[in-house]
Amino acid sequence: MSLGIMTIKETILKYGKNEKNTGKTDVQIALLTNQINHLQLHFSQHKKDHCSRRGLLKMVSKRRKLLNYLKKKNISCYTKLIESLNLRR
């Protein structure tokens, strides 16, 4: 279950300002959110796929840690990102 290359590049350009800025916290959170949304669609069809569910939980945990880091470092960027990704926090 992977995202398309174009989807990844568009996300990187939207949140990282250029295609090589993949390490920015905003970009990492946006990419994880896209992967999580993609996996949620997968689980609507494959309810017993427990191995992938473990990967999903790891992604959610990593995104939560990155969001906590961003909240500590830059609260304005954090609030903009939460609104643009439609996350509840």
UniProtKB/Swiss-Prot annotation:
GO terms for molecular function: rRNA binding; structural constituent of ribosome. One of its GO terms (biological process) is translation. Pfam families: Ribosomal_S15 (PF00312). One of its GO terms (cellular component) is cytosolic small ribosomal subunit. It comes from the Bacteria. One of the primary rRNA binding proteins, it binds directly to 16S rRNA where it helps nucleate assembly of the platform of the 30S subunit by binding and bridging several RNA helices of the 16S rRNA. HAMAP family: Ribosomal_uS15_B. Part of the 30S ribosomal subunit. Forms a bridge to the 50S subunit in the 70S ribosome, contacting the 23S rRNA. Belongs to the universal ribosomal protein uS15 family. This is Small ribosomal subunit protein uS15.
